[in-house]
UniProtKB/Swiss-Prot annotation:
Residues 1-28 form the signal peptide. One of its GO terms (biological process) is neuropeptide signaling pathway. This is Peptide YY. It comes from Bos taurus. The modification Phosphoserine is found at residue 41. PROSITE patterns: PANCREATIC_HORMONE_1, PANCREATIC_HORMONE_2. The lineage of its organism: Eukaryota, Metazoa, Chordata, Craniata, Vertebrata. It is found in: Secreted. CDD domains: PAH. Keywords: Amidation, Cleavage on pair of basic residues, Hormone, Phosphoprotein, Secreted, Signal. Residues 68-97 form a propeptide. InterPro entries: Pancreatic_hormone-like, Pancreatic_hormone-like_CS. This gut peptide inhibits exocrine pancreatic secretion, has a vasoconstrictory action and inhibitis jejunal and colonic mobility. One of its GO terms (molecular function) is neuropeptide hormone activity. The keyword Phosphoprotein applies.
Length: 97
């Protein structure tokens, strides 16, 4: 019975720490710009579109790593001896069954 009482404060501490960490991650993500009203001036629209373009560039920026390989580079890595790897729809030769 005592082990149940001791684990409760530890569990509460872990949950609070997790909430603080998640709060920090939310603050790191850029906020979407607020759209101006229907009767906005051209200057306000220009500022909005500039900030929207900046926001979209941040959110959709290219990440380097696994997805950076092009198909040509991947085929060179997979088939270093051949220029064009042959495409076979089924294996040639005698069937095993």
């Amino acid at each position: 019975m005592m082990s149940g009482r001791r684990s409760w404060p530890a569990m509460a501490t872990v949950l609070l720490t997790l909430l603080v960490c998640l709060g920090e991650l939310v603050d790191a993500y850029p906020a979407k710009p607020q759209a101006p009203g229907e009767h906005a001036s051209p200057d306000e629209l220009n500022r909005y579109y500039t900030s929207l373009r900046h926001y979209l560039n941040l959110v959709t920026r290219q990440r380097f790593g696994k997805r950076d390989f092009s198909e040509a580079l991947l085929s060179i890595l997979l088939f270093p001896d051949r220029e064009d790897p042959p495409v076979k729809s089924r294996p040639e030769g005698a069937y095993l069954w």
